[in-house]
Amino acid sequence: MKELIQRSRKSFTVVQSVEADVPDNVWIKCPSCRELIYHKQLAERMKVCRCGYHMRLKAREWLALLDEDSFVEHDAHLRPADPLGFVSPKETYADKLREAQRRTGLADVVVSGVGSIEGRRLAVAVCDFEFIGGSMGSVFGEKMARAAERAAALGIPLLTINTSGGARMQEGVIALMQLAKVNMALTRLAAARQPHIAVLVDPCYGGVTASYASVADIIIAEPGASIGFAGRRVIEQTIRQKLPADFQTAEFMLQHGMVDMVVPRSELHSTLAKLLRLYAAEGRATAHKSEPIVTALASL
């Protein structure tokens, strides 16, 4: 027996364990239902959990709504400056910009250009909340204004996908001026008889909501998106009243007439395609006094 034990001991080799090099974000936890989801499966659903929770998309991820290889980017060379030489106790504005650019790979919040949906061309401007909270500064406003003017010049609709925390305080009054600048560009788009379709995604606050996003011809919100001007806590502290639990949600805004429809992300492409077809038909039939597009929208 002793010899058997000695022989069996010699047959084993101790192997040190090797830690696997697993990339970050392979599994993503849903903030709502807490389910762990494999990142490729989540990407296939455009980051919508099976429970219906809509996770945030980066600006370039939104371009999946367009026809494949149809998007041509414009104004990518525009980069924000630091006109005020803004310095906070923690960091300078210049440092904050460099870090945001390094982390996101973007020059600023907005990615803009021209693409198509089911073959119909449109100008596109998409916001990325990861870049300094989607804040509206000089480059943000310039890109939005140019997108509207480009749509007017080409005679095509404008689609904006909007998420923002408000004006960028580091640029002061220059940031606030962008609200008026973008709205003026949109008046030229309206004069060209081209529609502006705005999609509001979580979160959408401040100057973006208070200006161009709220004057679009069609305003679409994603389910559960937080939409407003000032934040919930600021309002409660100001009016000293408790607000409803669903206050400032997309569904609350729809109920009170602030948005035209709430559309799940899985249905957004088809909804946009229908809207573009309706507007194209409306444009062709204007001389014949066609049925108003608002009536046609009731069927969506």
Swiss-Prot record:
Record keywords: ATP-binding, Cytoplasm, Fatty acid biosynthesis, Fatty acid metabolism, Lipid biosynthesis, Lipid metabolism, Metal-binding, Nucleotide-binding, Transferase, Zinc, Zinc-finger
Residues binding Zn(2+), per UniProt: 30, 33, 49, 51
GO biological process, one term: malonyl-CoA biosynthetic process
Enzyme class: transferase
UniProt cofactor(s): Zn(2+)
Zinc fingers, C4-type class: 30-51
EC nos: 2.1.3.15
Catalytic activity: N(6)-carboxybiotinyl-L-lysyl-[protein] + acetyl-CoA = N(6)-biotinyl-L-lysyl-[protein] + malonyl-CoA
Pathway involvement of the protein, from the record: Lipid metabolism; malonyl-CoA biosynthesis; malonyl-CoA from acetyl-CoA: step 1/1
Pfam families according to UniProt: Carboxyl_trans, Zn_ribbon_ACC
One Gene Ontology term, aspect cellular component: acetyl-CoA carboxylase complex
GO MF annotation, one: carboxyl- or carbamoyltransferase activity
Residue ranges that the Swiss-Prot or TrEMBL entry lists as coiled coil: none
InterPro entries to which the protein is assigned, alphabetical: AcCoA_carboxyl_beta (IPR034733), Acetyl_CoA_COase_Trfase_b_su (IPR000438), ClpP/crotonase-like_dom_sf (IPR029045), COA_CT_N (IPR011762), Znf-ACC (IPR041010)
Cofactor info, note text: Binds 1 zinc ion per subunit.
Subcellular location field: Cytoplasm
Domain CoA carboxyltransferase N-terminal: 26-294
HAMAP family xrefs: AcetylCoA_CT_beta
Assembly mode: Acetyl-CoA carboxylase is a heterohexamer composed of biotin carboxyl carrier protein (AccB), biotin carboxylase (AccC) and two subunits each of ACCase subunit alpha (AccA) and ACCase subunit beta (AccD).
Function field: Component of the acetyl coenzyme A carboxylase (ACC) complex. Biotin carboxylase (BC) catalyzes the carboxylation of biotin on its carrier protein (BCCP) and then the CO(2) group is transferred by the transcarboxylase to acetyl-CoA to form malonyl-CoA.
Family per similarity comment: Belongs to the AccD/PCCB family.
Protein name from the UniProt record: Acetyl-coenzyme A carboxylase carboxyl transferase subunit beta 2
Organism: Roseiflexus sp. (strain RS-1)
Underlying gene: accD2
